[in-house]
C-alpha cells in the first residue's frame, strides 16, 4: 500500500507507519476503539503537519527511524492470527487453547518472519512465535478484523495480509 500511495500522492504526502490500536467497525463511519495504542510513524522531512495534527488530536504518537520493521512485525502477528480466527470463527485467545490452531499459528508466524529475513527486514522482536502468542493472549477476547469482515459479509484483508507475504516470498524462490 505504501508504494501505491507514493505513486498516487507523492512522497511528501505519505508516511509509513503502524498502530497498535484495535478497533471494531460498528457501521459506516462508526468505529469503537479497542483500547489506547500507539501510532508509530517513520520520521521524514514532510511529517511535520501530520505530526502536529495527530498530537493535537491527542493520539499517542511515536516517531521512529525504521517503520518498515514495525510494519513487518505487525504483518507477522496479523498473518498468524487473523486468517485462523476468521476460518475457525473464534476470538484471538482461543487459538492458544486449541493445539492444532496454535501449531498453525506458530508456523505462520515463522513463515512470515522467514520472508521478512529474506527481504532484509529486521523485526521488532526476536521470537515471532512468542510475539504472536503474546498478542493472542493480550487480545484474547477480541475478534480479529478479518473475522469481523467475514461475519458482516465484507471483503477481507486476506490479500493485503497473506498476499503481501506471498508476493514478497516469491521474489526469493
Regions found by a protein language model. Give the residues of each.
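Rossmann-like NAD(P)(H) cofactor-binding subdomain of soluble oxidoreductases
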Residues: 1-30
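Short, hinge-like loop/turn segments at secondary-structure boundaries
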Residues: 10, 31-35, 79-80
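Residues at the C-termini of beta-strands that transition into short coil/loop
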Residues: 18, 35, 65
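Short beta-strand and adjoining strand-loop segment in the mid-core
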Residues: 29-51
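FAD/FMN-dependent oxidoreductases across multiple families
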Residues: 48-82, 130-131
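NAD(P)-dependent Rossmann-like dehydrogenase/reductase catalytic/cofactor-binding core
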Residues: 55, 106-173
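Active-site-proximal catalytic alpha-helix in oxidoreductases
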Residues: 68-114, 140-141
Amino acid at each position: 500500500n505504501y508504494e501505491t500511495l507514493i505513486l498516487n500522492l507523492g512522497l511528501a504526502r505519505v508516511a509509513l507507519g503502524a498502530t497498535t490500536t484495535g478497533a471494531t467497525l460498528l457501521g459506516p463511519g462508526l468505529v469503537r476503539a479497542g483500547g489506547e495504542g500507539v501510532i508509530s510513524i517513520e520520521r521524514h522531512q514532510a511529517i511535520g503537519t501530520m505530526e502536529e495534527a495527530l498530537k493535537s488530536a491527542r493520539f499517542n504518537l511515536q516517531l521512529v527511524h525504521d517503520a518498515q520493521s514495525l510494519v513487518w512485525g505487525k504483518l507477522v502477528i496479523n498473518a498468524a492470527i487473523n486468517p485462523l480466527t476468521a476460518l475457525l470463527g473464534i476470538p484471538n485467545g482461543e487459538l492458544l487453547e486449541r493445539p492444532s490452531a496454535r501449531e498453525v499459528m506458530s508456523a505462520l508466524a515463522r513463515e512470515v518472519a522467514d520472508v521478512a529475513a529474506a527481504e532484509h527486514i529486521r523485526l521488532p522482536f526476536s521470537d515471532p512465535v512468542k510475539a504472536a502468542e503474546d498478542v493472542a493472549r493480550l487480545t484474547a477476547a477480541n475478534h480479529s478484523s478479518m473475522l469481523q469482515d467475514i461475519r458482516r459479509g465484507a471483503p477481507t484483508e486476506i490479500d493485503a495480509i497473506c498476499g503481501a507475504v506471498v508476493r514478497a516470498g516469491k521474489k526469493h524462490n
